[in-house]
Amino acid sequence: SNQTGSVYFPFAIWARRIRELLSDSQQKRMINPPCGGILELREAIARHLKDFHGLHVSPEQIIIGAGTEYLYGILIQLLGFDKKYAIEDPGYHKIAKIYNSHNVDCDYIAMDDSGIRISELEEKNIDVIHISPSHQFPTGITMPIGRRYELLGWASKAPSRYIIEDDYDSEFRLTG
């Protein structure tokens, strides 16, 4: 078996820390979090984005939500129901189901060895592309920097174009 045995996990320490956390902050934990998420968490995410990705964002620009389906619904509301959305093909088809459940037009963009084919975005009149360039599912492709610049070039040609980057596991990326 590849699994680490439970004998190595410090259950006693873990249980003690959980008890301390719950008893020290009972009152605070019972309050509903603010819309958009707990400020301390959004501040930590903003620091992480700056330190590890070079992105300068304020905590007010970060929204914490209860799962991807909910958050993609918010994105659709913000970007517009009139936009034509697209996802990678092959790709994570649950994303297409989410877009379809919000009654937006969603298409598929074929991939080659470097990721999505940028020319198809133009051909299909796509407004919003949903990609996972750091580790594409299910192919595992890491989009090279040249293709990323092509994608940015596509987006810059019209103010109605957007890129949704699903960076679900970029911390595990070793190349690209």
PLM feature spans:
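Walker B catalytic acidic pair
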Residues: 166-167
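N-terminal basic, amphipathic alpha-helical segments
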Residues: 1-19
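Conserved core of the PLP fold type I
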Residues: 18-21, 25-160, 170-174
